[in-house]
């Protein structure tokens, strides 16, 4: 399987490719690298690109997409582009202007999917991570239902084909789903999900409510300093994964990706080495169970800088 023709239907009728390419760049690389890897990814068969305002790569990603459209490699309607609303713009009056800012950087007319990046508001302003004189993040309070109504207006205006959320727990999803006058349900919830954090209960809840789970960090995340505990285990070194890779004559990464896809999850990948997942390769139910049992509720991106925020999502069971 590659991402060319494999999609799942969202609850608003649009389709999302099951395999996406992440465009966040490690801090040690220049942001301009995003243009290069996006062009390579398009050539490799990717159609689904995941980005965000806070990644500071949207101008480069947009340039890559436009160049590939201009030379006939792809068409805009064959690209599925996701952007995300950052925490400093959760006030409803800031939502549309933030999306328009992303569109201006991209030089595109619309995004295919627009997500609330985190359910935690930060003080609005020019800084993505505003802090006080002691270096502590400046939290803000916003009604997520009001933010969601502004997201719905972006969809109605044609600026986003679909709208969803990211890093929401069950309680926060329920708040949106139970909102009086809800016009559009979130089409997805993008969360960290991998063999060590399989999100079984959250996945079941999302499926029950027609919400697709989109997984980042499927291979254990890039080990960003400041965000990821450098002492945490390396997922791809898991012995069970290694032995299963030998059994199926695949790489450990492809086994990890296939496991999530067979669970009905849309997966984001940042490695161009793993862009092709053999269509005829399927894990047996017994092996799926073995991989399910590797769960240890280990969160690589624990969001520690947000701890203490009233909307911090990772204290609930799911």
UniProtKB/Swiss-Prot annotation:
The record marks 84 as: Lowers pKa of active site Tyr. NADP(+) binds at residues 20-24, 50, 166-167, 190, 216-224, 270-280. One of its GO terms (biological process) is positive regulation of phosphatidylinositol 3-kinase/protein kinase B signal transduction. Substrate binds at residues 31, 117. It is found in: Cytoplasm. Monomer. PANTHER family: ALDO/KETO REDUCTASE. This is Aldo-keto reductase family 1 member C21. It comes from Rattus norvegicus (Rat).
């Amino acid at each position: 399987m590659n991402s060319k023709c494999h999609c799942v239907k969202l609850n608003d009728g649009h389709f999302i490719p099951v395999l996406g390419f992440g465009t966040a760049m490690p801090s040690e690389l220049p942001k301009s690298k995003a243009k290069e890897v996006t062009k390579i990814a398009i050539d490799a068969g990717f159609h689904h690109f995941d980005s965000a305002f806070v990644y500071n790569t949207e101008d480069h990603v947009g340039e890559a997409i436009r160049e590939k459209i201009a030379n006939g490699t792809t068409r805009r309607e064959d690209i599925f582009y996701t952007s995300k609303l950052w925490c400093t713009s959760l006030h409803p009056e800031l939502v549309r202007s933030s999306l328009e800012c992303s569109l201006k950087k991209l030089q595109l007319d619309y995004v295919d999917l627009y997500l609330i990046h985190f359910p935690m508001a930060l003080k609005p302003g020019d800084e993505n991570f505003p802090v006080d004189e002691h270096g502590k993040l400046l939290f803000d309070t916003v009604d997520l239902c009001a933010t969601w109504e502004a997201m719905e207006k972006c969809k109605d205006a044609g600026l986003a084909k679909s709208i969803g959320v990211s890093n929401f727990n069950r309680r926060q999803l329920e708040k949106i789903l139970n909102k009086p006058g809800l016009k559009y349900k979130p089409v997805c919830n993008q969360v960290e999900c991998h063999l060590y954090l399989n999100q079984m209960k959250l996945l079941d809840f999302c499926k029950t409510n027609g919400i697709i789970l989109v997984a980042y960090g499927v291979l254990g995340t890039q080990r960003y300093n400041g965000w990821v505990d450098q002492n945490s285990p390396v997922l791809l070194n898991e012995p069970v994964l290694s032995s299963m890779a030998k059994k199926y004559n695949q790489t450990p990464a492809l086994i990890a990706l296939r496991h999530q896809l067979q669970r009905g999850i849309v997966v984001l990948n940042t490695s161009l080495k793993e862009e092709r997942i053999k269509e005829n390769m399927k894990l047996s139910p017994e092996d799926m169970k073995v991989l399910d049992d590797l769960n240890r509720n280990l969160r690589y991106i624990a969001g520690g800088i947000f701890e203490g925020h009233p909307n911090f999502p990772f204290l609930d069971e799911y």
